[in-house]
Amino acid sequence: MAEEEEAKTEANGQQQAPQMRVLGQFIRDMSFENIMAQKGAPSDAQPDVQVQVNLDAKKRTADNQYESAIKLNVTSKVKDGDATLFVLELDYVGIFHVDNVPDEQLHPFLLIECPRMIFPFLRRIVSDITRDGGFPPLNLENIDFLSLYRNELARRQSSEAPKMDA
């Protein structure tokens, strides 16, 4: 019965709703450096945590399959100094099967919706790694992937804009 409705929808020329399935997710690359332990210094200092997020997506060889990656760099320094407490670099990837997304909407879909699906798992990994590294668990705030995407588009457009000579 559902197949008949899909056939009717296609026959009427209406577009089907976008569909996405997570086929897998994995850590492509990870590095955690506990600088304080290497230096033998006490880790009771007040931390200043800086988080950088980069996104990447690419098509896989299979039909309608894509990779969406969140690249996270976390640096924690002593609040009142230059000493680094720890550095965490994590490249977390999701593999997705995507159907019924128009080509002009595919790029934002892969860089907004797909990262949104895998982010809770990345957050847990970051929390576990920092805790296991001897620090309080770092609980990342939610990331607004739409704003991140828009900011990146604006940055690219401003860097491509012709410069005016005064």
From Swiss-Prot:
Keywords: Chaperone, Cytoplasm, Protein transport, Translocation, Transport. The keyword Chaperone applies. It holds the Pfam family SecB. It is found in: Cytoplasm. InterPro entries: SecB (IPR003708), SecB-like_sf (IPR035958). NCBIfam families: PRK05751.1-3, secB. The keyword Cytoplasm applies. One of its GO terms (biological process) is protein tetramerization. Belongs to the SecB family. It comes from the Bacteria. PANTHER family: PROTEIN-EXPORT PROTEIN SECB, PTHR36918. This is Protein-export protein SecB. It comes from Roseobacter denitrificans (strain ATCC 33942 / OCh 114).
